[in-house]
């Protein structure tokens, strides 16, 4: 028997779990626009208050993937998504976007799934536009971009049209809900490997186990203990790693890789223009904190993509990709390739 929205709401009020098949049904109602905004708002708020379970998040992500416009990638060896939940409040430049260029220059294929800034001063879509990249591509054009340049940016609104049914509710609520953690779980290119940053330490263990249930191959979920949704230079980083079906949780420190622990304060930006400048300086091999944090994250992404056998090996490859100028060249390559699809 299917659950009604009213029954689901009662379940959340009593702090009881909504089971997998029930959650599939509820999410399909939301994504089709068949649930009233009042009930949708009540349920997603109730889930947040009770705390979403791994099973509930897995079911919700499964439905979001069902409704997505997919990008078909033929060869998914060394294929990785580099993404953050956002919402860490750090207002740093776009580290994961810079990481994409370095990882691609070092031999990974990257399908980056992102959006405009909501909580940040500059989302991945904003800085890519500032770099001259056309972000408004159709799924088959993104696939061509990945095949040709080793990189593809999937602008979330183009791939999740059903989200428009819940967008006004989310906007009016103005608080974090399950949808804030679903984005990184719903890559439209189905990248089997992932470096995922999260905004809360509890999400490290949760998100990596959701990815395990969703059938991912090699995933590193990270949370910098200074609050960053990246691998941090300013503190230890909590890691949840899925590899060969097994989950391991551990901490890493910059010193483990011969790097100095240094505050991330200098990485703050006010807008996409400032983010662009800092990103290009890092990729241009300008010594400093920006280059180091991009190197650290790219090394981790290359390990996740199975291009490198360890994070340390990945960092070495990332250093070479930046020093050789290949990482900086990737920016112009992506801009050139995507501009041909300008509508």
Swiss-Prot record:
Anthranilate 1 binds at residues 84, 115. 5-phospho-alpha-D-ribose 1-diphosphate binds at residues 84, 87-88, 92, 94-97, 112-120, 124. The keyword Oxidoreductase does not apply. SUPFAM superfamilies: Nucleoside phosphorylase/phosphoribosyltransferase catalytic domain, Nucleoside phosphorylase/phosphoribosyltransferase N-terminal domain. GO terms for biological process: L-tryptophan biosynthetic process. Mg(2+) 1 binds at residues 96, 230. Signal peptide: none annotated. It catalyses: N-(5-phospho-beta-D-ribosyl)anthranilate + diphosphate = 5-phospho-alpha-D-ribose 1-diphosphate + anthranilate. Binds 2 magnesium ions per monomer. Gene3D superfamilies: Nucleoside phosphorylase/phosphoribosyltransferase catalytic domain, Transferase, Pyrimidine Nucleoside Phosphorylase, Chain C. Keywords: Amino-acid biosynthesis, Aromatic amino acid biosynthesis, Glycosyltransferase, Magnesium, Metal-binding, Transferase, Tryptophan biosynthesis. Anthranilate 2 binds at residue 170. Its cofactor is Mg(2+). Its EC number is 2.4.2.18. InterPro entries: Anthranilate_Pribosyl_Tfrase, Glycosyl_Trfase_fam3, Glycosyl_Trfase_fam3_N_dom, Glycosyl_Trfase_fam3_N_dom_sf, Nuc_phospho_transferase. Pathway: Amino-acid biosynthesis; L-tryptophan biosynthesis; L-tryptophan from chorismate: step 2/5. HAMAP family: TrpD (MF_00211). Homodimer. Catalyzes the transfer of the phosphoribosyl group of 5-phosphorylribose-1-pyrophosphate (PRPP) to anthranilate to yield N-(5'-phosphoribosyl)-anthranilate (PRA). Belongs to the anthranilate phosphoribosyltransferase family. PANTHER family: ANTHRANILATE PHOSPHORIBOSYLTRANSFERASE. This is Anthranilate phosphoribosyltransferase. It comes from Burkholderia thailandensis (strain ATCC 700388 / DSM 13276 / CCUG 48851 / CIP 106301 / E264). The lineage of its organism: Bacteria, Pseudomonadati, Pseudomonadota, Betaproteobacteria, Burkholderiales.
């Amino acid at each position: 028997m299917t659950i009604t929205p009213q029954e689901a709401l009662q379940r959340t009020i009593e702090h009881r779990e909504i089971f997998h098949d029930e959650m599939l049904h509820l999410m399909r109602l939301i994504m089709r626009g068949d649930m009233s905004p009042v009930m949708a708002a009540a349920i997603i708020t109730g889930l947040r208050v009770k705390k979403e379970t791994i099973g509930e998040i897995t079911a919700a992500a499964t439905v979001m993937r069902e409704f997505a416009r997919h990008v078909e990638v033929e060869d998914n060896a060394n294929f990785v998504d580099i993404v953050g939940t956002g919402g860490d409040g750090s207002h740093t430049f776009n580290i994961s976007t810079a990481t994409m260029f370095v990882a691609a220059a070092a031999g990974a294929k990257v399908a980056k799934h992102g959006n405009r800034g909501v909580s940040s001063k500059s989302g991945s879509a904003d800085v890519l536009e500032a770099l001259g990249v056309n972000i408004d591509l159709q799924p088959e054009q993104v696939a061509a971009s990945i095949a040709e340049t080793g990189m593809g940016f999937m602008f979330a609104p183009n791939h999740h049209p059903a989200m428009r049914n819940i967008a006004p509710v989310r906007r009016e609520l103005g608080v974090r809900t399950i949808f804030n953690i679903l984005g990184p779980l719903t890559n439209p290119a189905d990248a089997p490997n992932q470096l995922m940053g999260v905004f809360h330490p509890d999400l490290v263990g949760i998100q990596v186990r959701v990815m395990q249930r969703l059938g991912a191959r090699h995933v590193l979920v990270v949370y910098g203990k200074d609050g960053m949704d990246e691998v941090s230079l300013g503190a230890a980083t909590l890691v949840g790693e899925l590899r060969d079906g097994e989950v391991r949780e551990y901490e890493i420190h910059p010193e483990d890789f011969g790097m100095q622990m240094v505050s991330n304060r200098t990485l703050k930006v006010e807008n996409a223009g400032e983010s662009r400048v800092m990103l290009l300086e890092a990729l241009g091999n300008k010594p400093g904190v920006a280059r180091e944090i991009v190197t650290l994250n790219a090394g981790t992404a290359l390990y996740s993509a199975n291009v490198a056998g360890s994070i340390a090996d990945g960092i070495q490859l990332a250093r070479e990709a930046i020093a050789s100028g290949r990482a900086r060249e990737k920016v112009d390559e992506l801009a050139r390739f995507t501009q041909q699809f300008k509508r």
